[in-house]
Amino acid sequence: MSPLVTLDQATFRFSETGTLGPISWQIESGQKWFIAGRNGSGKSVLLGLIEGGGRIQSGQARGIPQNAVVVSAAAHLALIDRERHQYDGADDKFKGSSVADILSELNPVDKVLTELIRRFQLQPLLGQRFRQLSTGETKKVLFVRALAANCPLLILDEPLAGLDDGSREVAMDSLADFVGGKTVLLVLNDWAALPDWIDHVAYLSGGRIDYQGPMDPTAARSWLGQMVVLTNEAQALPAPLPSSVPGLS
């Protein structure tokens, strides 16, 4: 594997008062990372920085791609906001992008897109305007658009949020079938939903990565739960083992 992204003691400023880091982290092509940590630990901020936002204050950040595809609350709102601002006006002939237009924007792999449209039952929506869809429908479209995209890096920040139970199951099955050789960065607050195709974990605490390395998903579900308990109770964490998931008694 070759490095796709390298952070070397990088500290980022993401707001007037907020910083993240220092962080040293290497993401290699094809790796599937699960980003874990308590609420407020910096998971979403870190993914946003990998996407290309924020200003580096110190250290180095190399290889951050310009064509990462993102599923997140922020990406969802940005797409809705784009459609609203682009087409709100007196000229009624501009009614917004169709669902088919939205799905075709990111150079999709046609066979994958066709199958995902079938799985999520989006065919009746293709001719509708994106801005006219329900929240759940827009979430499905954003997910399908991202997974079908021909891109090297897929960033998934709570990708199941806003989906009904049936669509969540379809989404997880589709990820297992179609992530393929893509590099994936995934945040899920539900440890039980951690997919079997994940092969690495990074655990954040206080804006820093405390643990990173290869992992077995089955062992990791228990390990991550114990890490959260230890952090919540302010207990001393075990010594980092960067090359493997540490076993906790």
Question: Could you describe each region identified by the protein language model?
Answer:
Residues 129, 158-159:
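Walker B catalytic motif
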Residues 142-143, 171:
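Hydrophobic anchor residue at the start of the ABC signature
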Residues 157, 164, 168:
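ABC-family nucleotide-binding domains
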Residues 44-107:
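ABC ATPase nucleotide-binding domain signature region
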Residues 190-196:
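Conserved H-loop
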Residues 108-125:
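Conserved ABC ATPase "signature" region
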Residues 208-231:
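Conserved beta-strand-loop-alpha-helix hinge in the C-terminal portion
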